[in-house]
């Protein structure tokens, strides 16, 4: 009886899971060639995938959840997916270069999603890009609500001006990363001090910063640099994104599970420098910490001890290491100043030698990871080609040996023919002089094979 109840419960759970998958998939449309003509009437969030792509298969359940969530909240954005290998011409038209590629299509515009492949991040991207490019903030209450909701956002304060046109141009390019708002001077919080109008501000890290055209240069470049919080928990994706800012990244490489003084101290030092020395270093440095050294080891092609501090130049793969432990904030500030004045020598880079080293390192890492994860698969992948090459080499060697033997047989046969001709000539000369006497026959030389038989 107990077994029957367990079996019934198991079947019920399986049925629920299957139904849930069917329901989720029902809100994601499979797109075909007709999508090109019909898409302009709606806003579409599309996953361009390939059936054989492993990352695409990992994204599929998340994508189904995105479709279900967007439908449940009544979003005007439709969610779909397209096999980019079957409809390659359409995928090429939208600029698909790899798989999976997520794009939001709004009218004639196509926006690439480059963030983490999580449900919440994808949905936030869809809401941000599908809405107005510049969102108005009509009241202080709305302003405060946006401050609580977004960790980083930009605000234009003022009326029509050339600065506003630049702001709109920057927003059209960078809306895929952050939010852009506009407000009147009366709506801005009282603690904000503006020396001149119009102005562009960024609100983050529980404070604000004002754009200065003379000090900060191009507005789009400034927004691209300031769209990150001053201190971040880093991962590989964030480091890749920071490569566009031109900033150096000061990292405390720690083990977050380790609560010893060495690990917590380095993290606190970096946080304090990021907070207290922002005016000195924020134009050139981004601060943060990373849990574990696996990614950093791959990036540096070296084994870093944990905990440690490393400064990365993600634009050219250079890095800076200190030959001693950083014990306090003063040590870290001195390290940064030495990097800025060129006292500390950069390591790594993207030279030809480093690129060759990278190829060898990546190949070695791939082989090691395969053997660690699946030794049998590694033996098959690398043993089979080696076996084929060995057989080919053996075949070439034996073919040369047989050729030599055939050549030797040819030389032996040639000499036998010459001997036979000489014997026949001697017979003809002896027959007239002997007058019919019997001449003993000369035994012909034996073939090489006959000699072997004897």
From Swiss-Prot:
Signal peptide: 1-24
Pfam family, one: Thioredoxin_6
Enzyme class: isomerase
Chain span(s) of sequence motif Di-lysine motif: 451-454
Endoplasmic reticulum keyword on record: yes
Cytoplasmic side: 397-454
Keyword Transmembrane: yes
Domain of life: Eukaryota
Sugar-modified residues: 258, 313
Keywords: Disulfide bond, Endoplasmic reticulum, Glycoprotein, Isomerase, Membrane, Redox-active center, Signal, Transmembrane, Transmembrane helix
Domain Thioredoxin: 25-128
Lipid bilayer topology: Single-pass membrane protein
Subcellular location: Endoplasmic reticulum membrane
GO cellular component: cell surface; endoplasmic reticulum; endoplasmic reticulum membrane; plasma membrane; platelet alpha granule membrane
One annotated GO molecular function: protein-disulfide reductase activity
Region of interest (Disordered), residue spans: 412-454
Tissues and organs where the protein is expressed, per its UniProt entry: Widely expressed. Expressed in brain, testis, lung, skin, kidney, uterus, bone, stomach, liver, prostate, placenta, eye and muscle.
UniProt-listed Gene3D superfamilies: Glutaredoxin
Family per record: Belongs to the protein disulfide isomerase family.
Domain comment in the entry: The di-lysine motif confers endoplasmic reticulum localization for type I membrane proteins.
Name under which the protein is recorded: Protein disulfide-isomerase TMX3
Origin species: Homo sapiens
Lineage start: Eukaryota, Metazoa, Chordata, Craniata, Vertebrata
Gene: TMX3
